[in-house]
Amino acid sequence: MLRILSRKLLSSRLLLGLFLLALAATLQPAQAAKKESFRIAWSIYVGWMPWAYADEMGIVKKWADKYGIEIEVVQINDYIESINQFTAGAFDGTVMTNMDALSIPAGGGLDSTALIIGDFSNGNDGLVVKGEGDIAALKGKNVNLVELSVSHYLLARALDSAKLTERELTVVNTSDADMVAAYKTADVEAVVTWNPLLSEIAAEPGAKLLYTSADIPGEIIDMMVVNTEVLNDNPDFGKALVGAWYETMAVMSADDEAGKAARTFMGEKSGTDLAGYEAQLATTRMFYEPAEAIAFAKSEDLMKTMDVVRRFLFDHGILGEGAPSPDYVGMTFPSGATLGDQANTKLRFDADFMGMAAEGAL
């Protein structure tokens, strides 16, 4: 079965990614121009399966045709590789989390725009221990997780809640493919992982779910991120993507046969079935309506979250090569608020195109 939440792997090819980031700086001027053909990438995850449906059902083509452009939709099974390719100029947009948007394209110098805020994890990620105990009891223990992933971030937030630091325990880097088997061994005491692995581990006898992404709602965000220069030179590209997305949201969220068929398609395409996909939707806060995503984008909470995220990335040395402080990368928000060095603004949270969708102006 395919990994349902492959979005979270931070692969060992990070050095290659850093090279591509440096290369991107030379590619962008050539990219930024009026054009008629675009490419976007997506990878398997509950909140990104709508792109597969929108492509297969001709919804993306319908909206691209409306604006006289072409949009190619490409599935990339290696999530981090899809971001590396986006950063290097192979794609005009791709799906990614807020954390990865800041650390990879933005941290590497590519001016990027979060065009669509699709959802946030609301229980899809969790910390499980064997037996009784609380977060404070993790002190001195090993915790298995995919290092430098959102699982690592979730652990940091869990430790914050108990006034602990990573220095007081040991992080054991473990691949997602090995996580369930590792948990079943006698020497593994705690793991942090994501669904469907999380559900499988939490169902083991004696397993206790201590902390989940539902405890930090709105912090692990899933988005469609596009090249800012390409978007500025080709606003119809943004309009077509947003139009296709919210048409798909309307279909999949409906409590009718068409909605059920859409969710079934998305489940099967991601390697599960309707029940499995809907179980994952239950722990995902989807923004089916553009107004919901806009309110989230304009809230103070988003800026506060990104402040926490940038400090986590800086502390772990992945905010950008040679970043001197958490302020290294500048960010802008729809509220008008900013974070970081505005002379180096590389991540922009945008609500204008979602606003057009909300107003029926696409």
Locate the predicted segments by residue.
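Bacterial N-terminal signal peptides that target proteins for export
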Residues: 2-16
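Bacterial N-terminal signal peptides
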Residues: 13-26
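Sec/Tat signal peptide C-region and signal peptidase I cleavage site
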Residues: 26-32
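Short, glycine-/small- and polar/acidic-enriched structural segments
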Residues: 33-173, 178, 189-195, 218
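Sec/Tat-exported extracytoplasmic proteins
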Residues: 64, 90, 95-98, 105-108, ...
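Pocket-lining segment of extracytoplasmic ligand-binding domains
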Residues: 178-274
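Secondary-structure end/capping motifs
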Residues: 232-322
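Conserved C-terminal helix/tail region of periplasmic/extracytoplasmic solute-binding proteins
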Residues: 309-362
